[in-house]
């Protein structure tokens, strides 16, 4: 049975709704190169090698990730975004993108995907909406299918609090622990939470300075967190999760033993 969700107008985000992409630069054309490099470095290794894999890109915007996958030879990629102007930019480049609201699309489609990639931060959804969204993703993945999504990192002492406050439609942040926690609750498995590396533009000398400073900050942050009994390890501005749909379970039903105290709370 499909999860019943509220129509799009009842979702909480209004100014920058979740089912559109809001991170594109003013020079949209330039974003195909910069975001393409960022996505290739951080995500491409987690996409199945089979070029026939059915891949859904949610909140695709002008099609940055769709463009990367298409260039890499993937032939069954579909991008959806709720803003027609952004989709028009993608289709003008010959990319397979359509106008659709994410929740409605996931509720209505009947053909499962091998991969669902969420291009917009999930922080644009409330906690209740995130649970519904994850259940919808679950229902639209094949057994063993892969979900990739990302979030603002609340563990970063410099950007964590500001990231929550700087956008009216940011409703939460996550840490490595809480991102894993909600995916376990929705019965995803093989969960891997990774830092998203911003410093992937290796032709820019300042990139290496930023990488070095980030490593120093990470050591300082880890030391100070341990002073308070915390064991956070990831302090990048954003984090991502890669997980798989487990077989023989029901979405949203947590199994005994998943909750545990391990000092991260």
Question: Where do the PLM segments sit?
Answer:
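Conserved N-terminal segment of class I S-adenosyl-L-methionine
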Residues: 1-119, 128-135, 236-239, 248-265
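Hydrophobic/aromatic residues located in beta-strands of well-ordered beta-sheets
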Residues: 77, 147-149
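A C-terminal cap/extension of S-adenosyl-L-methionine-dependent methyltransferases
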Residues: 97, 148, 181, 192-265
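A short His-aromatic
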Residues: 123-125
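Short glycine-dipeptide loop
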Residues: 141-147
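Short, glycine-/aromatic-enriched active-site segment of Class I SAM-dependent methyltransferases
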Residues: 149-172
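Short alpha-helix
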Residues: 171-187
């Amino acid at each position: 049975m499909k999860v019943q969700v509220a129509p799009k107008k009842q979702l909480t985000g209004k100014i920058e709704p979740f089912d559109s992409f809001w991170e594109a630069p003013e020079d949209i054309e330039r974003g195909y190169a910069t975001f393409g490099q960022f996505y290739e470095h951080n995500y491409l290794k987690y996409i199945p090698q089979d070029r026939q894999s059915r891949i859904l890109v949610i909140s695709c915007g002008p099609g940055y990730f769709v463009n990367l996958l298409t260039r890499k030879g993937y032939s069954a990629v579909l991008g959806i975004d709720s803003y027609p102007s952004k989709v028009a930019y993608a289709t003008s480049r010959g990319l397979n993108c359509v106008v659709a609201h994410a929740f409605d699309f996931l509720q209505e489609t009947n053909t499962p995907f091998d991969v669902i990639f969420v291009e917009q931060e999930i922080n644009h959804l409330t906690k209740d909406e995130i649970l519904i969204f994850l259940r919808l993703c679950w229902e639209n993945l094949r057994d063993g299918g892969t979900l990739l999504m990302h979030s603002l990192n609340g563990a970063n002492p410099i950007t964590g609090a500001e990231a929550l406050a700087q956008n009216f439609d940011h409703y939460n942040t996550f840490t490595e622990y809480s991102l894993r926690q909600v995916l376990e609750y929705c019965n995803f498995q093989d969960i891997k939470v990774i830092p998203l590396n911003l410093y992937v533009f290796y032709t820019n000398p300042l990139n290496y300075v930023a990488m070095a400073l980030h490593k120093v900050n990470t050591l300082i942050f880890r030391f100070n967190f341990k002073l308070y009994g915390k064991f956070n390890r990831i302090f990048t501005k954003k984090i991502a999760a890669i997980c798989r749909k487990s077989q023989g379970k029901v979405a949203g039903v947590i199994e005994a033993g998943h909750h545990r105290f391990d000092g991260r709370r």
